[in-house]
Each structure stands twice: as structure tokens, then as C-alpha cells.
């Protein structure tokens, strides 16, 4: 399997690398993509060095089976067709596609079968607090039907990216 990570230089991109390694995700080839600022950086994965390629509108995704994308919603929207046009499955970590009816919103522990119906070649995932909640709710639902859930959450500043984190740090007295 040929795998790509888009946004590899960010915190989530680095977490993708860590989890893929930790879970011994089967892959024959890995391709890393990033912004013009990140292009040229080198990362080590499973003892091999990989150089980040600049994400561009070209055919770089031809032959790639799956792309894990975490480069912000604007980038996801802009590069959706570039990533999927040759059959690559785009697993997007941003909020860009969460409300699109033709993009499945998948939490593997809850609704993995929904990932099989992806007319646009894109799979989205919910917000991080939602993921944790629906995994727990699924276990309860399996025991007894849930009629209603009322939820309030506090969102982490990290979800808004590095700029928001820096702003948050400046605002703390």
C-alpha cells in the first residue's frame, strides 16, 4: 500500500507518523507533503528518511492508495480533486467536509462500514471531543437504546492550529 501524509510538519501530521508506526500500519511506500515552507524537510520513519514534497496541483497522488490530510480546511477543499482524481482515498482531519452529505463522517469504532461509501473519495472525521463521546455512546447504545443526549464541550485552542496556540499563550497572564 502506498500512503501519503499531507501536512506532515504540523502536530497532527507528526501524530499520523507516530500512530502509523506504533500500529505497524502496512505500507510499501510513504510520501510526505507540506507547504512551500515545509518542503525539503526530512523526517525519519521506520529507519528510513523521507523528504517533504511541496503540495501542488499536479499528478503526485497518482498511484497513492490513501492520503491522511491535516493541513487545514482551506487546503483540504482546494486540493480535494488533486488528491482524489486518480483514485486516492482522502482521509481528512479538518472540518472542511463534515457537513457534506456525500462525504461519510466516520469514527472507525462506531461506523466503519460508512467508509466504504465515499462517492467523492473523501472520508471525514468528527471533531475530537465528538469522537470520544460517540465511542462511549456506542457502547451504551449497544446495551440500551439512547433517546437523547445533551452535551456541552470546551474546545482546545490547539484545534485552531499553531497561530491560535501562540495567541492563547500570549493571552495568559
PLM feature segments, named:
Residues 1-171:
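N-terminal Rossmann-like NAD(P) cofactor-binding subdomain of oxidoreductases
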Amino acid at each position: 500500500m502506498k500512503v501519503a501524509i499531507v501536512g506532515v510538519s504540523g502536530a497532527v501530521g507528526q501524530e499520523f507518523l507516530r500512530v502509523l508506526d506504533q500500529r505497524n500500519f502496512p505500507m510499501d511506500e510513504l510520501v510526505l507533503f507540506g507547504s512551500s515552507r515545509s518542503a525539503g524537510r526530512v523526517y525519519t520513519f521506520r529507519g528510513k528518511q523521507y523528504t517533504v514534497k511541496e503540495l501542488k496541483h499536479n499528478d503526485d497522488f497518482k498511484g497513492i492508495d490513501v492520503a491522511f490530510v491535516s493541513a487545514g480546511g482551506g487546503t483540504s477543499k482546494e486540493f480535494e480533486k488533486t488528491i482524489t482524481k486518480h483514485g486516492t482515498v482522502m482521509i481528512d482531519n479538518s472540518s472542511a467536509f463534515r457537513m457534506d452529505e456525500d462525504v461519510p463522517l466516520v469514527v472507525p469504532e462506531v461506523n466503519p462500514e460508512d467508509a466504504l461509501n465515499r462517492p467523492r473519495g473523501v472520508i471525514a472525521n468528527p471533531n475530537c471531543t465528538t469522537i470520544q463521546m460517540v465511542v462511549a455512546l456506542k457502547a451504551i447504545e449497544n446495551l440500551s437504546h439512547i433517546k437523547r443526549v445533551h452535551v456541552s464541550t470546551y474546545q482546545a485552542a490547539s484545534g485552531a492550529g499553531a497561530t491560535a496556540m501562540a495567541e492563547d499563550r500570549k493571552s495568559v497572564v
